[in-house]
A protein has these predicted regions:
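Accessory nucleic acid-recognition modules appended to NTPase machines
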Residues: 1-151
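Switch/connector loops and helix/strand junctions flanking conserved nucleotide-binding motifs
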Residues: 86-87, 163-164, 193-197
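Arginine/glycine-rich "motif VI" loop of SF2 helicases in the C-terminal RecA-like domain
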Residues: 122-123, 172-180
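Hydrophobic/aromatic residues located in beta-strands of well-ordered beta-sheets
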Residues: 130, 183-184
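Short beta-strand/turn micro-motifs composed of small residues
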Residues: 134, 157, 187-188
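Short glycine-/polar-rich loops that comprise or flank the Walker A/P-loop
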Residues: 149-150, 179-183
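Short beta-strand-loop-alpha-helix junction that forms the active-site gateway
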Residues: 156-164
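Domain-level recognition of nuclease-like catalytic cores that cleave nucleotide substrates
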Residues: 189-210
Length: 210
């Protein structure tokens, strides 16, 4: 009887993208993902390179040249199309506006803001780079916009108004960077207001209405 050999099935590209479908903006830990999918780490690297070349995902790098060396260096991963992400996850407007959907709305809104800023890079008169920030003491900022003149730090919240908690890490970054810190902005789902020296909240709609 002839021996037969069955090649083990490799996870599909969908398996990789699905890892960020329900948790957009999660940090990429390649070893952990390789273990979860039962593949070699090199396979994870190749698949993510392919997903990125197909413009299905974006890896938001950690840190910036102006920040501390205490920061964690893992990138965050976002699916490029927020609407597709919501549709594949069966999350409609009714769900996202409900109490049960509150935990999903925040990450989706952060994903949307990152994708909008990526589009802005194509036509902005001021060149800028995008990063995220998290250090070993737990300080975290959703998005760092690095311009030639300095840094703009951005937090994203699905709440209608920003509170002192939303500005906590922005203030710490402002005090650490001094004049290099241009602004700290909390993007909300409603109106904005001033919140101190170089700090303010703005509606998400300001990304395309200003």
């Amino acid at each position: 009887m002839p021996l037969t050999w069955h090649r083990p099935e490799s996870p599909s590209l969908a398996s990789y993208s699905n890892c960020w479908r329900l948790s957009p903006g999660a940090e990429l830990v390649q070893d952990r993902l390789a273990h979860k999918l039962d593949v070699a780490r090199g396979t994870v690297v190749r698949y993510f390179d392919l997903l990125e070349s197909l413009f299905l995902i974006h890896r938001l790098p950690a840190g910036s040249r102006n920040l501390t060396k205490r920061q964690i260096q893992r990138p965050k991963v976002f699916l490029i199309d927020t609407g597709l992400n919501a549709a594949l996850s069966n999350m409609d407007a009714a769900h996202l506006s409900s109490m049960q959907g509150a935990d999903h709305l925040g990450p989706l809104l952060e994903q949307f803001v990152v994708c909008e800023l990526l589009r802005h890079q194509e036509w902005s008169a001021t060149p800028f780079k995008l990063f995220h920030y998290r250090d070993r003491q737990g300080a975290e900022v959703d998005i760092i916009v690095e311009t030639p003149a300095g840094i703009i730090a951005v937090e994203v919240t699905s709440t209608a108004a920003a509170t002192a908690r939303h500005f906590q890490h922005l203030k710490a970054l402002r005090d650490r960077l001094g004049d290099e810190f241009l602004a700290g902005i909390v993007l909300t789902t409603s109106t904005g207001q001033k919140a101190g020296d170089r700090l303010e909240s703005l509606p998400v709609s300001s990304l395309w209405s200003r």
